C-alpha cells in the first residue's frame, strides 16, 4: 500500500512514455463508490470537481478510499484558479485536469499554479496532507517535478490555439472535452458530427506533433476504440454514474418488463 506523497509519479511517467492509460470518470462523489471503482483495475480515475458535487470535504475521503489502489487519482478542477488548485494540491492531488483552456497564457497559469517558486506561484504551507503534515523532508524538492497537468480543449479558440497550448512547458497532455467542443462548434448534443470529429482528430494530431499525448472522454465503446486508433493515449471509457444508471435500469427492466 502506497502512502502520500507518491514519488516518482508513475502516472506522469506513463503519459510521457506514451503508454495507453485507460480510465474512468467518477461523478458519484462518494468514498464507497470511489473505493469500489479503485478496485476495478483502471489506470486512472478522474474525480470531477467541475460538474459533479465535489469539494474539499468530499475529495479527502475519496483520496483516502483510493489509498492502495493502482488507479491514479486525477482531479478535474472547477476552474483554472490558483487558490483552488493550491488547496487541491495541499490535500494530496498530483494529477490535474484543467477545463476550458483556450490560450497559451491560460495553460501557463495552470502550470504556474502547481509549482512552488521560482518555477511557479504555489503558496507554501509546511504542514498539510500532501506532505504527510510536514514529515516528508524532501517534499519541496520533489513536488514540482511530480505534478501532471492535463489541459482541456473544448472551444473553437482552444482549437485555434492548440499548437501554442501543446507547446507550453509543463503541460503533459492535451485532453478533449467532446460535449462542450460540440456545443462550441454549433452541434450541441452531437459530438459525433463530422465537424466535431474532424476537430478532435486535429487536436490529437497537433498534440502528437508537439510530442504530447492526447486524451478524451468516450463512454461509447466504438468511440473509445476509434480515438485509440487515432492515437489517443489517455481515454476515459465510462463513468461510475453512467455504469450505475445503466446497470440499475437493466436490472429493473429484467423484472419489471
Swiss-Prot record:
GO terms for biological process: D-glucarate catabolic process; galactarate catabolic process. Its cofactor is Mg(2+). It catalyses: 5-dehydro-4-deoxy-D-glucarate = 2-hydroxy-3-oxopropanoate + pyruvate; 2-dehydro-3-deoxy-D-glucarate = 2-hydroxy-3-oxopropanoate + pyruvate. GO terms for cellular component: cytoplasm. Pathway: Carbohydrate acid metabolism; galactarate degradation; D-glycerate from galactarate: step 2/3. Its EC number is 4.1.2.20. The record marks 76 as: Transition state stabilizer. GO terms for molecular function: 2-dehydro-3-deoxyglucarate aldolase activity; magnesium ion binding. Pfam families: HpcH_HpaI. Mg(2+) binds at residues 154, 180. Substrate binds at residues 152, 179-180. Homohexamer; trimer of dimers. Belongs to the HpcH/HpaI aldolase family. KDGluc aldolase subfamily. Catalyzes the reversible retro-aldol cleavage of both 5-keto-4-deoxy-D-glucarate and 2-keto-3-deoxy-D-glucarate to pyruvate and tartronic semialdehyde. HAMAP family: KDGluc_aldolase. This is 5-keto-4-deoxy-D-glucarate aldolase.
